[in-house]
Amino acid sequence: MASLENPAIDSSSEFESSSEEISSSKESKPKEAPVTVPSTKTLNSPSAAVAVSDDSESEKQSFVLTRRKKKEGAAESPAVKSGKKEGAAESPAVKSGNNEGATESPAVKSGKKRASEGTTSRDMHVKRIKKEGDNKKGHAQRVWSEEDEISLLQAMIDFKAETGTSPWDHKDRFFDIAKKSISFDVSKVQFFDKIRSFKRKYFGDRKVRSVESDHDKKCLGLAVSFWGSDGVSLETPVKKKVKDESVLVKANSKEKNVKPLVKEDEQVVILGEDSEWFEESFLVPVIASLGLDEYSVKKKWSKVSVETKKRIQEKMKLVDAKKCELLLANMDVLKEVTSVLTQTN
């Protein structure tokens, strides 16, 4: 009996060992998807197992989404920074746009400058022309040296003394004679313009005369010798030819023969500077008081030679100078008497 029971026990033990080997072999196999089951009850219901699997998947998805969002957030922050940088880069672009506007303003300025340059160039051209014209005038005026001016005035005096006529009556003759004493090749227009300028300079304003320099004083003396103290020259007597014809005048129904008003070749006297100082002097009324009328006195004076007139005029200047000295002496006496009277109580 004992022997029979032992094989059974052995068989049972062998069965248990074989079952343990099978279980160990099962445990040794890798599990594909181990799922933790909280209780046996959950295993018994398939809906509960599906819910557990869905929750785990949703948790996984939420975890993945949160991870992804974090990664995207970490990736977006540089993007935002890059956006800011792009904005910062755009601001220079805007600035560059403004700079383009600023660059356009120089273009406008350049256009204005060009326009101003055009106007200024025209103005400069006009000014240059005016300046050249002024320079030409100044050059034409500077052509005459001091020696030339004195030579011209002296030639005028000599011509008038030799011929008894004015240089204006014989321009060609006077020009041919006087131009030899000029240091440059002078034209006739320049020649007589210079004579006119002398008269304007020294007799244009009788109150103020250009006598600042010694040269002007010398020229003024020569000009006075030619034109006189008042700048009115003795002109050459002008001959007017009038036909010797009778003028019929009816008076009381009777015709009377009247002599011509002006005879042929009769000289009409034009009184000039030499006659003017003579008329303004005391000589004319004194001589007229002796029995001659003033017209006859003036007419006879116009026929006197230039040398004689000049000599008498110099004497009159001495008389005038003595008159001035006498007047100054009278003024000194008057001043002294006035001062004495004011000091006397």
Curated annotation (Swiss-Prot):
A single Gene Ontology CC term: nucleolus
Keywords per UniProt: DNA-binding, Nucleus, Phosphoprotein, Repressor, Transcription, Transcription regulation
Broad class of the protein's primary localization: nucleus
UniProt key word Cell wall biogenesis/degradation: no
Name this polypeptide is given: Transcription factor STKL1
Pfam families: GeBP-like_C, GeBP-like_DBD
Single GO MF annotation: transcription cis-regulatory region binding
Organism: Arabidopsis thaliana
Residues bearing the modification Phosphoserine: S105
InterPro entries: GEBP, GeBP-like_C, GeBP-like_DBD
Annotated segments matching region Disordered: 1-145
Basic and acidic residues bias locations: 23-32, 114-137
Known role: Transcription repressor that binds DNA in a sequence-specific manner, 5'-GCCT-3', to regulate the expression of PGR. Acts as a modulatory component for the glucose-triggered developmental leaf growth process.
One Gene Ontology biological process: cellular response to glucose stimulus
Compositionally biased region (Low complexity): 11-22
Transcription as UniProt keyword: yes
Protein localization: Nucleus
Induction context: Up-regulated upon glucose treatment.
Tissue: Expressed strongly in leaves and flowers, weakly in roots, and very weakly in stems.
Compositional bias (Polar residues): 37-46
Gene behind the chain: STKL1
Family classification: Belongs to the GeBP family.
